[in-house]
A protein has these predicted regions:
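Extended C-terminal regions of large enzymes
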Residues: 1-9, 15-456
Length: 456
């Protein structure tokens, strides 16, 4: 459960506007378990599998442990996606957080290494940080930054001051702001400021040069309070650009939602998913390309359960990569429908794979379900959202990315010179529609698909 903040897609801001601080639900009945022994056995299986699983490192470094991986592959978004490498990456990575600011004493549910956790969880991925001296003192009540946050409020903005990033994270969690959109919006403003599309008169005198940690922290507070220039940025970079009438060439959005810290120029299936996803750019709506590229042999048995048997070359975006994106999107949608954690459960590197998840549902409900039936649940959810969007006039025309991803090449490191090929990408989008059974011209679900999914 999320016990601190709920910011992505603006839900935290909506709660804040209503002065709603939390939603608490209490029941007085225990859920009926169809096969307790089978469920207990799955728990034992997970305990035994944990040491050799892909989630063991999350307990020590959290998701910030992947900073070095992203840097090595040229996929660490830097200076508002102008580059995929950041010279100051070591200042914001997992080991640095662990050694420098991770809370070190037991308080409440936290353990001796400053890890908060969901009830009964073996992985214990959440970070809790505390800073008691210097210009940025940070209260552990507001948790700590994970990978997305150290990137968006770090490398995106060219900031290599970990304490400033932790402080900005605290402010976001205090106000219910999404750290991804907040950091990306500030990075957009910094690039626009550098290009003189935004002036110091508009920023209220703030010097929004890349790397200015003090300005980043101050602007985060201003956004949360809708003060001064923060009021212009408070609804995201796309609306800020529209309001100012300039700066669109610096946007990194899909459906007006800022891109997370996984670069679509590097992970090409995400270039597709960011665009076609019903609620815009999201890194937790499908599996990532490496699982179906060089990492396939590690996850072969699990992916084959989903019918994924033909690993692809890096940065490819042909029909089979589209198939990977679509099927894992359905699977992740299923996980959301079941309210399962995407670190504990998933199609590749996670602790529990597709086979175990089927057994889990069978044990709890007693239903004799198959993986195909469960994938249809995820597909049904996505089509419901797609139908809602169609009613609101959101269709193929909005299934795209900001021009920057197509027009500007990355600078430096392994991804130097990379950009998204528009022709290849548009062909992949059409292929995705065909595989989904949607109308290619509009991108909307067809009557046949809606009837098949009992949504007609």
């Amino acid at each position: 459960m999320c016990n601190r903040a709920n910011g992505r897609t603006g839900m935290g801001a909506v709660m804040g506007s209503k002065n709603l601080k939390a939603v608490a639900v209490r029941g007085n009945q225990k859920p009926a378990i169809a096969d307790k022994e089978a469920l207990t056995e799955l728990g034992r299986w997970g305990f035994k599998a944990f040491p050799s699983s892909g989630v063991t490192g999350l307990g020590k470094y959290g998701t910030a442990g992947v900073v070095s991986v992203q840097q090595t592959m040229g996929g660490l978004p830097t200076f508002n996606f102008r580059s995929g490498v950041f010279d100051g990456w070591k200042t914001i990575d997992g080991p640095t957080i662990y050694e420098a600011v991770l809370k070190g004493r037991e308080t409440g549910k936290q353990d001796q290494e400053g890890r908060d956790t969901c009830f009964g969880c073996l992985i214990r991925c959440k970070r809790v940080v505390e800073i008691n001296e210097g210009p940025y003192q940070v209260d552990p009540l507001y948790g700590g930054p994970e990978y997305e946050t150290v990137a968006t409020l770090g490398s995106y903005c060219g900031v290599n001051d970990l304490t400033a990033t932790c402080k900005a994270n605290e402010i976001c969690n205090k106000y219910g702001l999404d750290t991804i959109s907040c950091g990306a919006t500030i990075a957009w403003a910094m690039e626009a400021f550098e290009a003189r599309a935004i002036t110091s008169n508009e920023t209220g005198g703030l010097d929004l040069e890349f790397g200015n940690a003090e300005a980043m922290v101050k602007l985060t507070e201003m956004i949360g309070r809708r003060e001064g220039f923060g009021d212009i940025l408070a609804e995201g970079s796309a609306r800020a650009s529209q309001r100012l009438g300039r700066g669109a060439e610096f946007l990194i959005t899909a459906k007006n939602q800022e891109a997370p810290a996984h670069m679509p120029q590097v992970k090409r299936s995400l270039a597709l998913i960011y665009a076609v996803n019903p609620f815009g750019a999201d890194h937790m709506s499908s599996d990532h390309d490496p699982s179906y590229e060089e990492g396939f042999e590690n996850f072969k048995k699990r992916l084959e359960v989903l019918g994924l048997t033909q690993p692809q070359k890096p940065r490819s975006l042909g029909p089979e990569k589209v198939n990977f994106a679509r099927k894992t999107q359905h699977f992740y949608s299923l996980l959301d429908s079941l309210n399962l954690c995407q670190f504990a459960c998933g199609p590749s590197w996670q602790l529990y794979g597709p086979v175990e998840i089927v057994k889990m549902l069978q044990a709890v409900t007693g239903w004799d379900v198959t993986i195909e039936e469960l994938l249809a649940v995820g597909e049904r959810r996505l089509n419901m959202m797609r139908a809602f969007n169609a009613r609101e006039g959101i269709n193929r025309n909005q299934d795209t990315l900001s021009e920057k991803f197509f027009e500007k090449t990355l600078k430096g490191g392994p991804s130097d010179g990379w950009k998204i090929d528009r022709v290849e990408w548009e062909a992949a989008r059409d292929e995705y529609y065909r595989q989904c059974g949607w109308d290619v011209k509009s991108g909307e679900p067809t009557r046949h698909v809606l009837d098949r999914l009992n949504l007609g």
